[in-house]
Every structure is written in structure tokens, then in C-alpha cells.
């Protein structure tokens, strides 16, 4: 880590937030990947990296995402911003709101594509935060970001033509563990990249800003990820529990079978012996009906060298209803009959 909180212009790495808001809009069903997005005169006028969209042309949201993630298209960014929020200015307000919610305290966006503008700044740490949000919430971004070449079709008044997209992220072809994510470069920002990679179960993000050359930014990103992969190891446990029961009070049944919830994952960066991890299953003693399937009724506690490193929920395998008056009568009658037989 070096100068992680120094404010700098991010160039097209800005588009990570733009794509995050696009996926947010898709998830909320405000838009769909099949929607046709019109291109305004303003969007078509964007300089820098572009796919030469023309005024009045339409492209699907899916195609616009390809243009942004693969070719870093400034014109596609503005077209999407206008489609989602009505104007780039309104969209940028949403970008800053999303950034604040993610804890990106040293970030201020002025536009949606990263062209040099006064006050348009972020930090390496903040870029890592928005990158993590994008890849964890919308892992499908990797399909876009890892596409090396793709063709799109322009349909305009001039006719139909093909346009080739080539990925600006050379790590896609040069680094075996690469999974994305976004490059950027301008005269003011120099060369930037938010690189993501995965090896075994370890996923890393390496952010480089203000490198002097394109080659340098990629070399630095690879160096950081190789260092991270060498230091990090993952312990995961999703082994099913042996059959166990929890005692339920005031229920139509006195016992309920339990099971583990989600798998447990622990990331170690200190070279600890993961074989020394121990786990203890703790089922709550006071469980009152009603109990719903999936309710948390205990936890699996994981420790390493005597220190707790995390927990995983133990949940009810099925539900148990609260006992009513008739249920108590049946129980009392059953006990009475058993007593008479004895």
C-alpha cells in the first residue's frame, strides 16, 4: 500500500461507478439489458475513447455495457447516464450518493466517464471500494470485462456498419489470473487501472494510479496481485453437520432437527497454519415456538490459536408451530395413559 488516500484524477476508472449504477438500474428493473438506448447529440459529441455513436442511433443496454467495459467508450457512458437519470448531471449526483454510501470519503465525481475536469478526484482506496462492490454484487461484470474483442453494429441514417471493440486492459491476455476490471488514462491522470484477479479461492483487487506509462501500470498491478496471492490463503467449511436436534419449548414438537447455514470462509494474510482451526457447535438452549424454517438457533464458532476468527449460523431445518390448548390436552392425556399402563 502506498499513497492509498491521496486524491488524484481517475480517468476512465471512473466508469466502474458508472457501470455499478447501470447494473443497479437493471437489478431494480428500472431498465433492462434489452432496452434500446437513444444517443443524444451531446453524448455523440464526447471526445477521447469512444465507439463513434451517432445522434439518433440506438443501442441496447447490453451493447452499451460492452462498449464501456471493453472499449472504455465515453459516448456510451453519457448515453446511459441520460437514459437512466435524464441528464449526465443528475446521474453524477447519483454517482456521488452511491460513493458516499460505500464509504468513499475522498471521492468527488464531476462527470460519468472520467474526462479531465476540475474537482473530479478519487483515491486508490476508494477505487478499491467501488471495484469490490461491483464484482461482488454483480459478478457478471467479469463476462464483459474479460472479453478481448467484440463487434457491435451501428444502424444510422447512413446505413449499417460494423465496429470492432478491443479491450483496453492488456492483462486480459497477459495475466493468467486476471478477471478484469477497468483501465483509464488522460494527460492529467496519467495511466490508471483497477485490476482484479482470482487464484484458487482468493480474489484480489490491485489499484494503480498516476503511472508514467501503460506498461508500468500493468506491471505494478501484476506485482501487487502476485504478492497478495503469495500472502493470502483461504479456509472454507461447508461440511454438513451430523444429525442434531434443538429443544423447543411451547411447541407442538419438543425437538427440531438443525443444520448449518451458509458456508464459512476465512482469509488469512499472516501465514497461519489453517489446519489448527477448530470449530465448536453451540445450539441455543432457550428456543421458543413458533420456529420457522431457516431461523437461527445456534452457531458454529471457529477459533485459531485460541482466538475466535468467525461464526457460521446453525438454522432450523423445518418449522415448529406454537402449541395450543388442544395440543397441551393431547400431551397431558398421553402422559396420563402411559401412567395408567405402568
Please annotate each region the language model reported.
Residues 1-139:
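Active-site-adjacent loops and short helices of periplasmic peptidoglycan-processing enzymes
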Residues 104-105, 116-121, 125-342:
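Domain-terminus/edge residues, biased toward the C-terminal soluble/receptor-binding domains
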Amino acid at each position: 500500500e502506498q499513497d492509498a488516500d491521496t486524491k488524484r484524477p481517475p480517468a476512465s476508472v471512473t466508469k466502474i461507478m458508472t457501470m455499478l449504477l447501470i447494473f443497479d438500474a437493471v437489478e431494480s428493473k428500472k431498465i433492462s439489458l434489452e432496452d434500446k438506448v437513444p444517443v443524444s447529440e451531446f453524448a455523440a459529441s464526447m471526445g477521447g475513447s469512444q465507439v463513434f455513436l451517432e445522434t439518433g442511433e440506438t443501442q441496447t443496454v447490453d451493447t452499451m455495457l460492452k462498449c464501456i467495459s471493453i472499449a472504455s467508450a465515453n459516448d456510451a457512458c453519457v448515453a446511459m447516464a441520460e437514459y437512466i437519470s435524464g441528464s449526465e448531471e443528475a446521474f453524477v449526483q447519483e454517482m456521488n450518493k452511491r460513493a458516499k454510501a460505500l464509504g468513499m470519503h475522498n471521492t468527488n465525481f464531476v462527470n460519468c466517464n472520467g474526462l479531465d475536469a476540475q474537482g473530479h478526484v478519487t483515491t486508490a482506496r476508494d477505487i478499491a471500494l467501488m471495484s469490490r462492490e461491483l464484482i461482488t454484487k454483480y459478478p457478471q461484470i467479469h463476462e464483459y470485462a474479460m472479453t478481448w474483442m467484440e463487434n457491435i453494429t451501428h444502424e444510422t441514417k447512413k446505413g449499417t456498419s460494423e465496429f470492432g471493440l478491443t479491450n483496453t486492459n492488456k492483462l486480459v491476455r497477459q495475466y493468467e489470473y486476471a478477471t478484469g476490471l477497468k483501465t483509464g488514462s488522460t494527460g492529467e491522470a496519467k495511466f490508471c487501472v483497477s485490476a482484479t484477479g482470482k487464484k484458487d479461492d482468493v480474489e484480489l483487487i490491485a489499484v494503480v494510479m498516476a503511472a508514467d506509462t501503460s506498461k508500468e501500470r500493468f506491471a505494478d498491478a501484476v506485482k501487487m496481485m502476485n504478492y497478495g496471492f503469495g500472502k493470502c490463503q483461504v479456509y472454507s467449511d461447508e461440511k454438513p453437520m451430523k444429525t442434531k436436534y434443538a429443544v423447543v419449548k411451547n411447541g407442538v414438537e419438543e425437538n427440531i432437527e438443525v443444520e448449518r447455514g451458509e458456508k464459512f470462509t476465512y482469509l488469512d494474510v499472516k501465514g497461519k497454519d489453517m489446519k489448527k482451526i477448530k470449530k465448536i457447535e453451540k445450539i441455543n438452549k432457550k428456543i421458543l415456538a413458533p420456529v420457522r424454517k431457516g431461523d437461527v438457533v445456534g452457531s458454529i464458532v471457529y477459533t485459531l490459536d485460541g482466538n475466535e476468527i468467525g461464526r457460521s449460523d446453525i438454522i432450523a431445518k423445518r418449522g415448529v408451530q406454537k402449541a395450543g390448548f388442544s395440543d397441551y390436552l393431547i400431551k397431558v392425556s398421553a402422559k396420563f395413559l402411559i401412567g395408567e399402563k405402568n
